[in-house]
Amino acid sequence: MINKTLLQKRFNVAAVSYDQYANVQKKMAHSLLSTLDRRYSANSSIRILELGCGTGYVTEQLSNLFPKAHITAIDFAESMIAVAKTRQNVKNVMFYCEDIERLQLEETYDVIISNATFQWLNDLKQVIRNLFHHLSIDGILLFSTFGQETFQELHTSFQRAKEEKNIQNETSIGQRFYSKNQLRHICEVETGDVHVSETCYIERFTEVREFLHSIRKVGATNSNEESYCQSPSLFRAMLRIYERDFTGNEGIMATYHALFMHITKEGKR
């Protein structure tokens, strides 16, 4: 289970540094936005709900792409919303500080979009059902999240360190994510046309600590309530193995496995 209080605190702290370190999240955002750009014309007066708007990177792009749209942007970290409101072009946006899993929607939307957020939900299936209910006919629910191969180098190095030290417990170094098939199954809804795609981004860093620092700066450190690594000696072993086994000519590598889901609400024409 995700500890929402801890997660909220971390995102509030990370608000000032998020954009500087969110390289992969921005790439994922552009993939989502290109789908909308192909689907709707610039003068469309569509209703858009953005969930997990963060610092407003996607929000501003939506406003630029669809200046006549009515955009509602939601995040549960007040500091993130404060940063988002400072962006130059968010004039057609209403911001609200809410938890997605407690959201009480009263309207329907042509587009519901979320970038790199749904991995933080404890009951994704229920959220999908709720959001689908608030899509207009032919509306689209479009989101990205992280898949199971994300940080595979980190998890592999940690497991090898545990084996080296003969540690048998269930401690982990980070959150585990859905596979492509698991996500597809979760997102199956009645009268919905479901499509899922995936891609992997490889980021390079000079050392493992730099990589871990970048994760902290976007607020994405482990927020699970279950056991996690607290042993300094195990952590040092993990760092050593990571740099030994996953260093190339351009530095150490870190995999980000991105899953892209879009669900169209079908109806009678």
From Swiss-Prot:
Gene3D superfamilies: Vaccinia Virus protein VP39 (3.40.50.150). It comes from the Bacteria. CDD domains: AdoMet_MTases. Pathway: Cofactor biosynthesis; biotin biosynthesis. Pfam families: Methyltransf_31. Its EC number is 2.1.1.197. It catalyses: malonyl-[ACP] + S-adenosyl-L-methionine = malonyl-[ACP] methyl ester + S-adenosyl-L-homocysteine. GO terms for molecular function: carboxyl-O-methyltransferase activity; malonyl-CoA methyltransferase activity. Keywords: Biotin biosynthesis, Methyltransferase, S-adenosyl-L-methionine, Transferase. One of its GO terms (biological process) is methylation. Converts the free carboxyl group of a malonyl-thioester to its methyl ester by transfer of a methyl group from S-adenosyl-L-methionine (SAM). It allows to synthesize pimeloyl-ACP via the fatty acid synthetic pathway. Belongs to the methyltransferase superfamily. NCBIfam families: BioC (TIGR02072). This is Malonyl-[acyl-carrier protein] O-methyltransferase. It comes from Bacillus anthracis. The gene is bioC.
